[in-house]
Amino acid sequence: MRNCRVLLVLVLSLVIVLNVVRASDESKVHIVYLGEKQHDDPEFVSESHHQMLSSLLGSKVDAHESMVYSYRHGFSGFAAKLTESQAKKLADSPEVVHVMADSFYELATTRTWDYLGLSVANPNNLLNDTNMGDQVIIGFIDTGVWPESESFNDNGVGPIPSHWKGGCESGEKFISTNCNRKLIGAKYFINGFLAENEGFNTTESRDYISARDFIGHGTHTASIAGGSFVPNISYKGLAGGNLRGGAPRARIAIYKACWYVDQLGAVACSSSDILKAMDESMHDGVDVLSLSLGAQIPLYPETDLRDRIATGAFHAVAKGIIVVCAGGNSGPAAQTVLNTAPWIITVAATTLDRSFPTPITLGNRKVILGQALYTGQELGFTSLVYPENAGFTNETFSGVCERLNLNPNRTMAGKVVLCFTTNTLFTAVSRAASYVKAAGGLGVIIARNPGYNLTPCRDDFPCVAIDYELGTDVLLYIRSTRSPVVKIQPSRTLVGQPVGTKVATFSSRGPNSISPAILKPDIGAPGVSILAATSPDSNSSVGGFDILAGTSMAAPVVAGVVALLKALHPNWSPAAFRSAIVTTAWRTDPFGEQIFAEGSSRKVADPFDYGGGIVNPEKAADPGLIYDMGPRDYILYLCSAGYNDSSITQLVGNVTVCSTPKTSVLDVNLPSITIPDLKDEVTLTRTVTNVGTVDSVYKVVVEPPLGIQVVVAPETLVFNSKTKNVSFTVRVSTTHKINTGFYFGNLIWTDSMHNVTIPVSVRTQILQNYYDEN
């Protein structure tokens, strides 16, 4: 068995582009994008790519050696090793939409599904109405899969869906028989990575040159969305229960495009490999595609083909595949949300109604409940210290967690140490623990910002997090007595009241930095302390399972819900699923309490934190009305975003001429209204489609943002057998006389059974394009 210390940041942080400096005349991988494929025969498409490359390089042999991938299923293009001058020649060709250099990226349950209302015990819910997602195929582009995991058993799973065209690719320690009726596909894509890293030693690499997962990230995400039933699973006794995915009878297809790099201690995902994985998934017949990947701020426009995920997702959505992406882990800062294309479902991360309280008992018998994943033995009353200079020595003392190593070892040896940190990185916890352990200490209590989810220590060393208020209480106790002592008990699992739901601190926030009128994220889902399968090679694996956090975990939650909805509504468009999820979302927690957003300071959550709210699977199954979108709507968006006619034509495969004047981006038929620069009154249009009772009457309810006037016409929508689509206008004006921040409200259509709700976000900008740093 291979062993490696894999830093948890890899599963908590979304994509970071790795800059590679090369000489300008050296060949490197470029992606040549040709737009929509012009022929249905993939062999014909590939041959055209080789001919184009042969014409450029002068011979078929050189073309063959240069070619990395031919994209021939979902769209047309290829990846090849080219010099800068060769790439420029291709870019000047009228057949070529865009040429871009390859780049490298890193990566971005037992309680989750009951929390979301999908209990197996209820025979009349979405889970059972859809036979648990049977016949729906979910594809994952990630780090691979551990096929022997119990989460991928095929007990009770029927025949492989007839529309599946993929297969299982053999490789290092992976053979085709590792697949079954649950795990029906597994492929790997490494050519782009190898072409850019010729020094990479595939023999000595600790990763598997196959679809087998080394670090466990891909296994974790796949088991969250579509894992089978596994009884009596816990993490060292915590978070125990019966484990399953959201759609436990859905089928799983794995596309490994991310590789562990020993020298970096990190994972890299080549753009060319990701695009090839997306291309293959379109050919293979996946219904839902889940990507826990993304880019870094600043983003490329969705209309810029350097946004590879948006480009691949466009073609997937055009073929009816629902694409779900993680929104990023750069929160709580505003304008950090990733994967913002309007054809992608972008997911924020929230907490569950579950926590792991860890009792801390002071010598004065006061009990404080911290948070940890401590599963070791109870630490009886032990000396407690806060390292500080009492003025009797010239030695250096520090109670700052990151500087505990500056203290003399005798200060911490045999004691529990209290420290404070303002550091928002998870490593502040693990490093503090390592410093105390190295000095012979017995435990550490870390006081930190109450809005930050610093990952608790992962071993059996007592390491407990509390907030500044409680930390100050502990410090005052230490200073009040000559011999302060403390007792630390193992963590426990607390579910339900009084644990509230929050948007996670790390979850990236809106508004959309590249297209502010497009609300992102779309939806929130549990992504904190999620227990799921992992690779046994992962250093934090316990029996092949692990607790992880990130929007990487939240995205497959939504992918699992979408798989159930796809089984119930097989003919819906990808936009219909997004609309159903957004318009029916929870804006309060299961106990009717407001959902807060963690950060400095904690506040009531708004659409920039979690879009429409937290995904509500049962309500999404019967939304009443949907805000549907198709190719025409996406073309409208592309035109309004400034893309030129020829590029749009090659992208969509049809001759496209944008109207003059261009249509407003505010008229894109999204299940949201976002106006980032309101000065004068604006009127926008939306169209809703009835997917509920044929004869229905809906009345409007407006909850306007503060200081904003919203008038809807008509105020009543009537549907019958002949009228299934109805348009309405929304007139928006402001009473504010100064530039403001965003204010939030809602527009609701109700027929007494359904409340079809879209968020309304408006910012008044009397002085346009003005940055106010005050």
Curated annotation (Swiss-Prot):
GO terms for cellular component: extracellular region; plant-type cell wall. Residues 383-478 form the PA domain. Keywords: Cell wall, Glycoprotein, Growth regulation, Hydrolase, Protease, Secreted, Serine protease, Signal, Zymogen. Glycans are attached at residues 128, 201, 232, 394, 409, 539, 644, 654, 725, 755. GO terms for molecular function: serine-type endopeptidase activity. Residues 1-23 form the signal peptide. It comes from the Eukaryota. Expressed in roots, leaves, stems, flower buds, developing siliques and mature seeds. GO terms for biological process: proteolysis. PANTHER family: PROPROTEIN CONVERTASE SUBTILISIN/KEXIN (PTHR10795). Belongs to the peptidase S8 family. This is Subtilisin-like protease SBT3.5. It comes from Arabidopsis thaliana (Mouse-ear cress).
